[in-house]
Amino acid sequence: MQVATRLIQAMLTVAAVLLVESAALAQAIVQTNSAPNPYRAIENWAKLPEGRTWGSTNAVDIDRDGVSVWVAERCGSFAPPSMMKPGLPFACSDSPLPPILKFDASGNLVKSFGAGALVLPHCIHIDGEGNVWVADGLGKDGKSHQVIKFSPDGKVLLTLGKAGIAGNGPDEFNAPSAVLVAPNGDIFVADGHGGNTNARIVKFDKHGKFIKTWGKKGSGPGEMDIPHALAMDSRGRLFLADRGNNRVQIFDQEGNYVDQWFQFSRPSGVFIDKNDIIYVADSESESVAKDHDGWKRGIRVGRVSDGVVTAFIPDPVEKATTTSAAEGVVVDAQGNIYGAEVGPKRLMRYIKQ
């Protein structure tokens, strides 16, 4: 009898734990579309040279001066990775235009470079020394599947990955989506863009020497589906936009799983400022991601400390059939938000009202 009683008590305890976990998860995935929007949109803020038009872009970051904005755009083309067709002109591989652009605080173009060096720029990251890192996505004609480090003036300083060769070895990528450099110089690459590409994070030292990799395709803790963007908080934790799983995953720098957040919708871009405010861009809900209906596209703002969403900037395009709203997001020292958009082909600026 005592054995049976203990067994029943144990089963009830397990059930209670599962119930609490289920309740917590249910609370975490409550839609956060109704948070207030204290921002006003500014279109056409960044000024391109006469005759040049914006291409698709999700690659945007802030210079170490805190106000200048760096962008890697796809050379005037509409070029999401899913549209890549062998043998056809595609993005920057067939363009003489420089894809890496730097704008001052007034939106004036002050620097550009990278012509002929990139195929599909998917992420731009400015490290603590001001160097410019680009994750160059899908390969074409012997190029790409690489991460490239440029000096602030456009000199190639380091290249990771094999040009045009997709793989999952320690010196290979398959459609790298994002790169981030830690304060100590360690390099983290989010490697993969869905389909038959990879689903992992790769870590290198500051010289580009392979350290480790973690993650695989799946939806469990530590697994990934389209690892799309990276950010780091003041505690040194990595935040991954795990887009295919509609969540943000949190890891330590050794790859140990910490947590997962669903309240930031379907994340394409993620940025954390010096005050540990997190900004997450959703460019696909109710358009490309039909399985995420009910969630609204836009930029969600929240706190790293507790994950609470405090503001929501909705997509200026109410109805869309393709990727829309910001796919990349960044914030300057004054708190202005910049959203890089693939579908509408533009860079939006949002200022507090």
Task: Tell where the protein language model's regions lie, with residue ranges.
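Residue-level detector of intrinsically disordered terminal segments
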Residues: 7-10, 28-29
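Eukaryotic scaffold repeat domains enriched in small/polar residues
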Residues: 27-353
